[in-house]
Amino acid sequence: MPEDVFKALADPTRRHILDELADRNGQSLFEIRARLATKHGLGMSRQAISQHLAVLEAAELVRTRRQGRYKFHDLNTAPLERIATRWLRTDAAEENQ
């Protein structure tokens, strides 16, 4: 599981997508595409962004929900929190001494 998170975070485009979802959750593919183009100068196809979103979903960093014909994407910080907690736990540091 952490390997999927690190793989997802390794790509700068996926980090931009996560930044955009952190700024405004619940975006459609069209909205994400427009924000990447205007704010980051990334003119990408819908298919390319969909592939990036699929990697983020596999790592559980993004959750999707459907409303009618539309699919909305939300940031899920739980995988990052699990990794950070594991590394920052004070009892884990004491065990290693």
Residue map of PLM features:
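Hydrophobic transmembrane alpha-helix bundles
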Residues: 65-70, 84-87
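N-terminal helix-turn-helix DNA-binding core of bacterial DNA-binding proteins
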Residues: 7-8, 12-45, 70-80
